[in-house]
Amino acid sequence: MSDRTTVMYYYDGTYNGFLSCVFESFAEKETPAAILPVDEADQTCLFGAKYIETDLRRAERVRVSIPKKMGMEAQDLLERAFFTCMPEKELRMLEFMRLGYKVGRGVCRRLTEPAVDKITKAVQFLEREAHLYLGFLRFAEYGDVLIAQIEPKNSVLPVIAPHFINRFSGEDFMIFDRTHKLALLYKDGATEFLQAEHIELPPESPEEEKFRAMWRTFYDTVGIEGRRNDLCRRTHMPKRYWNRMTEMRDKV
């Protein structure tokens, strides 16, 4: 494959779209200067750029080749990497795949390779953030629906969704990622992800503020003033999460 060219790839922002870009790169024996979702594209740079249509057949060929050539660990790593906020993540993933096709199943252990190191660290950050949201996400009751809003750096919603679906399988709920404009809807046992610029919240249930007040009282009561350590709290409960947490909202 040739060195990086000046051509830029634009795609629809989906994982299948990215895999279609990978197919195009190998088919044309070119390494693009950038791979960007079309909604992030600078319109002044579109001249001379390629818009890569999502081709499910081509995407599936690439998808099947990953575990076959690199192993399931590499497939899982790439799928998680797509949810990260890593700069130029598509190019870093393409670099990883080029290396993986070359060296095979040991690619994930080659941590001295920049492509592997960057993706591994990005996925670790994604997983740490997702883990924090398992404890920090707070629902509020709006009518018969539970609604929570999050503002993550990474696109953690697809990662944390199975946990909350399992935990609240008997409820109807929605989690809205304000950063990535993505909503998870769970109703009557069915799950759906929707892109949404914003959401119009229905009126809160009459009892909601009472529950919030009780939770804040409980949180403040169980704390031991003599053992208070604000630095330790900020370490384990980073301040950027507080504005969405019932017990911390008035402390922001």
Predicted regions and their residues:
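N-terminal ordered "arm"
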Residues: 2-56
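Short, hydrophobic/amphipathic alpha-helical patches that form generic packing surfaces
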Residues: 17-28, 94-102, 162-166, 212-220
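Charged, alpha-helical interface segments at or near domain boundaries
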Residues: 36-131
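Acidic, Ser/Thr-rich peripheral helices and adjacent loops at domain boundaries
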Residues: 50-58, 190-203
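Short coil/turn segments at secondary-structure boundaries
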Residues: 76-81, 178-179, 227-234
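Internal, well-folded beta-alpha domain core
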Residues: 105-195
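Long, compositionally biased intrinsically disordered terminal regions
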Residues: 172, 183-188, 199, 203-252
